[in-house]
Amino acid sequence: MISSLNGILEASGKDWAVINVSGVGFRCYMPATSPALIGGLGQRVRVFTHLHVREDALSLFGFATTEELSLFETLIDVSGIGPKLGLAMLSVMNAEALASAIISGNAELLSTIPGIGKKTSSRIILELKDKIAKNWEAGVLSQVTEANSDILATLTALGYSSSEAAKAISSLGDNGDLPLEERIKLALNYFNNK
């Protein structure tokens, strides 16, 4: 129904923003990182939205990118994952890190998200692994082994794209015997030496 909003950012909080579109202020629930990404107060912004309809409420969820929106809509298709939990997942991990954790089958990483236990993380992986792999940079992410999926998640959480992170991981060679912290340092050195 409402696929995007284009207007002036009037107010924002930790997980919401009010966008004024032609004199009407729309309150959107957003991942915790999104209000800072879309722009500053008083600036023209564009937010991609999902309208969630319940019998007692209409809730608008906004995202900085279409990728975030697509992942959110895919997540809430899983039984037991509602919009609030889907939003919480995208607040803890950015869309690329979350997608790579699901594609690589990293249930431990997913279960670190508040509200997601081992059973739920396993169900998410089972139901969404193939679906998300089709929609995301599956070619790049498939080069990342399960042993290096934590490095991929860390680098994407630091703001690197999944393709940049995959290049850094491929530069590591066979260092699987090193502790995770050392492999992350080596991957970060890849960006310092560029």
Curated annotation (Swiss-Prot):
SMART domains for the chain: HhH1 (SM00278)
Short name of one Pfam family: RuvA_N
Domain of life, source organism: Bacteria
InterPro entries hit by this protein: DNA_helicase_Holl-junc_RuvA_I (IPR013849), Hlx-hairpin-Hlx_DNA-bd_motif (IPR003583), NA-bd_OB-fold (IPR012340), RuvA (IPR000085), RuvA_2-like (IPR010994), RuvA_C (IPR011114), RuvA_C_sf (IPR036267)
GO CC annotations on file: cytoplasm; Holliday junction helicase complex; Holliday junction resolvase complex
Domain notes: Has three domains with a flexible linker between the domains II and III and assumes an 'L' shape. Domain III is highly mobile and contacts RuvB.
Function: The RuvA-RuvB-RuvC complex processes Holliday junction (HJ) DNA during genetic recombination and DNA repair, while the RuvA-RuvB complex plays an important role in the rescue of blocked DNA replication forks via replication fork reversal (RFR). RuvA specifically binds to HJ cruciform DNA, conferring on it an open structure. The RuvB hexamer acts as an ATP-dependent pump, pulling dsDNA into and through the RuvAB complex. HJ branch migration allows RuvC to scan DNA until it finds its consensus sequence, where it cleaves and resolves the cruciform DNA.
UniProt protein name: Holliday junction branch migration complex subunit RuvA
Organism of provenance: Dehalococcoides mccartyi (strain CBDB1)
